[in-house]
């Protein structure tokens, strides 16, 4: 709804042993759910009513970042977020004699999510670099609205490697893996060569 909304914006970092950083971020704020935001959410969306602005009174994240040797970096993190009017995509559709029509319905509810993850990256000069990331999510919504979680991520993982082929030319390989609450396996695979 309308009115004054307050949210924290606090970031604390503690550096130790020169290459390790422990951090705590406590953030929040509002996010306008306009046409651009909905289109980024899903290009096949339809809504039955105007989407309310999403309000996050708490988005807390704690973690440890480190670079113990040259070229190697890792991060361990966990967090908890509460969002009022969180966006949820749901699969919808209808059948006619001529065709089947499928689209993404967008609904809203209060969403709470706890998450934890790890990220590891390594780079050797300009010759090769790679990264591996993985995050697990545990979502909660208002009782009776669990169906809204069908497309929210339960696990996201990705792998990327870039290697120098010749001077000023690199080959890039990305692999993205996504597990939703009702879709057990989905993956995206990209191969790009750039100059």
Kindly label every feature range from the protein language model.
Residues 3-7, 11-195:
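Exposed, low-structure sequence patches enriched in small/polar residues
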């Amino acid at each position: 709804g309308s009115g004054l909304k307050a949210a924290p914006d606090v970031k604390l970092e503690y550096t130790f042993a020169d290459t390790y950083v422990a951090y705590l971020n406590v953030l929040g704020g509002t996010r306008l759910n306009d046409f651009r935001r909905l289109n980024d959410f899903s290009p096949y969306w339809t809504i039955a009513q105007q989407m309310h602005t999403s309000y996050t009174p708490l988005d807390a994240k704690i973690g440890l970042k480190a670079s113990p040797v040259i070229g190697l970096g890792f991060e361990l993190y966990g967090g908890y977020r509460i969002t009022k009017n969180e966006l949820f995509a749901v699969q919808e559709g209808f059948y006619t004699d001529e065709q089947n029509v499928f689209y993404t319905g967008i609904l809203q509810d209060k969403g709470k999510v706890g998450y934890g993850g790890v990220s590891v990256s390594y780079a050797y000069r300009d010759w090769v670099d790679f990264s591996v990331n993985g995050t697990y999510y545990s979502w909660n919504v208002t009782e009776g609205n669990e169906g809204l979680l069908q497309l929210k991520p339960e696990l996201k993982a990705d792998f990327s490697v870039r290697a120098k082929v010749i001077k000023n030319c690199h080959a890039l390989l990305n692999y993205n893996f996504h597990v939703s609450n009702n879709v057990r396996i989905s993956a995206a695979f990209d191969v790009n060569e750039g100059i």
